[in-house]
Amino acid sequence: MLPRRLLPLALSALLLGGCAGVGTQLPSAAYTAAFERAARQDSMRSECDWRVRYAPVAPEGASLAQLQALATARLAALQLTPAWTLAMPGSEAHAFADTDADRAGLQLLLSIVLPAMERYPAGIFAHTGLRRVVLVKDLSVEGQRRLAMPAPEIDSVVYADNMLAAMCPSGMELRVHHEYYHFIEYRLFNDFYYRDPAWLALNPPATVYGQGGAAAYGKGFQNLGHPHAGLVSLYAAYGPEEDKAEVFGWMMTPAYAPRLQQWTAFDPALLAKRHMLMEVLNTMAGSY
């Protein structure tokens, strides 16, 4: 793995160089600046294993219609349907167009989202009331740029290409699972911010949560792993709702699960949290 101080340079050189192959023109100065800014602001950059890559879901040159048809078929096998637009108060996003750049963005997004969703036990989405996966680009929530969000009010989770090519691929998969857990939590308690007493009881006595996950956005935040006993990541410390979603995300993402497993070998609080979420997952899968 590259030293952390070299990662932004490596991203710009390798990933942006690859983007130059899309179409016939080199990226504009504005695009290059936006790409490099997205790379620097990727909160999973410091904890990324850059060797982990996701296979394309379709041949190079697949049309937008072909990519959408492939996504529709694979999601149908999970009892899910895709949506290609988003209309929710406080949120904005754009639909993918049939351009080289958008096809490449959708191909990358699908290469991460589809296998992530296929990791779940059969029937779990139906049991939790998830019906749709919204796949868009340029997502923002209350003006904050986002890659994903839960949307239980429309029975959906939302995943977006938002300069995704500049970011850690496995970090995006972690976000897929993280946001789905927020969806699960809302279905269980009708509240995104439920302070579950059973969960809080697992914390070491010195655990103090922050002011919620939104406070981490736009500040160059780096989501470092296992900063304190009982916490899988720095972002987990922002609130019990983020703590749960982070443990779930690390547990479900193959590139991160081994580290969680290692930490639980000497952190009994984190081990208990992982066991609790495994029980939630198994209960929901088994009750379908």
What are the functions of these language-model segments?
Residues M1-P8:
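Bacterial N-terminal signal peptides that target proteins for export
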Residues G17-G18:
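C-terminal motif of bacterial Sec signal peptides marking the signal peptidase cleavage site
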Residues Q25-C48:
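Post-signal peptide N-terminal segment of mature Sec-exported envelope proteins
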Residues D49-A55, A76-A104:
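Acidic/histidine-rich, surface-exposed loop or edge segments in extracytoplasmic proteins
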Residues S63-A87, G210:
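Low-complexity, intrinsically disordered repeat segments enriched
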Residues G90-I154:
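Auxiliary, metal-adjacent structural segments of Zn-dependent hydrolase domains
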Residues G129, V134-Y288:
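Active-site-flanking segments in enzyme catalytic domains
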